[in-house]
């Protein structure tokens, strides 16, 4: 098992998330591994392979979007607060980006809720609507990098040029930083703390890890499209189009 940890070793000022919460992925190789029979669930039942994979589609992609909702919420909250600190909240282009971020978050939330509401019960287990949850995951994944761009644009270049914790603690530098980096209604330190939070989510190795997760975790974009294609009942729409066009339904 080869482990890959994401998030630099650092302090909670510069890395407010990864300094406290590590994300770990592994490359796991099973080479001549003995599996106890009580842990063997399929043994030649090839007809069950499809339903097993489908269960991944229905449940795992539901969790995929569900656990991303707090992330898109912090995009909205951090961007709004940073716009206040930067003194640009009244700018039309900033409000435009904030409205798009809000829409992104709420569409992801609404589609996830609807997938739960449209669940079917199988053997006493609620199964999310596969079509709707794949649409939710597809929307989240295909718009994630654009959302990052909106957040970065509102925050500004201090995401990568901001001072370190050591700089802020230096008596000779602290006065200059307080003078030039303080914001409307905010101290320089608080503004930098918020900037570092946004940087951690949009401009670090941890952010890159999250961006790859958005595309590939719990199923790739093409896998989601394939599921939507297979799950959607297009026949009623085809019949409706025929009726409006005056085409006989043979």
State what each model feature region is.
Residues 131-250:
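Alpha-helix capping/hinge segments and adjacent helical runs
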Residues 95-99, 127-134:
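Short, charged, amphipathic alpha-helical segments
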Residues 63-121:
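Extended amphipathic alpha-helical segments enriched in small hydrophobics
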């Amino acid at each position: 098992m080869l482990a890959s940890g994401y998030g630099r070793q650092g302090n909670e000022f510069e890395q407010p998330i990864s300094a406290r919460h590590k994300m770990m992925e592994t490359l796991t190789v099973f080479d001549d591994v003995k599996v106890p029979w009580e842990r063997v669930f399929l043994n030649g039942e090839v007809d069950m392979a499809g339903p097993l994979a489908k269960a991944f589609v229905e449940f795992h992609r539901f969790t995929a979007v569900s656990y991303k909702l707090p992330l898109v919420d912090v995009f909205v909250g951090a961007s709004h607060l940073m716009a206040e600190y930067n003194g640009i909240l009244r700018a039309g282009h900033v409000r435009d980006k904030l409205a798009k971020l809000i829409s992104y978050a709420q569409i992801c939330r609404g589609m996830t809720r609807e997938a739960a509401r449209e669940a079917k019960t199988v053997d006493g287990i609620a199964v999310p609507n596969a079509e709707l949850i794949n649409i939710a995951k597809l929307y989240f994944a295909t718009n994630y990098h654009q959302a990052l761009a909106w957040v970065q644009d509102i925050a500004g270049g201090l995401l990568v040029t901001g001072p370190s914790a050591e700089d802020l603690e230096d008596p000779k530098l602290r006065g200059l930083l307080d003078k030039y980096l303080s914001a409307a209604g905010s101290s320089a330190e608080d503004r930098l703390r918020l900037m570092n939070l946004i940087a951690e989510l949009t401009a670090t190795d941890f952010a890159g890890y999250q961006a790859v997760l958005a595309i590939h975790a719990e199923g790739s974009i093409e896998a989601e499209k394939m599921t939507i294609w297979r799950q959607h009942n297009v026949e009623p729409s085809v019949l409706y189009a025929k009726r409006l066009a005056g085409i006989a339904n043979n």
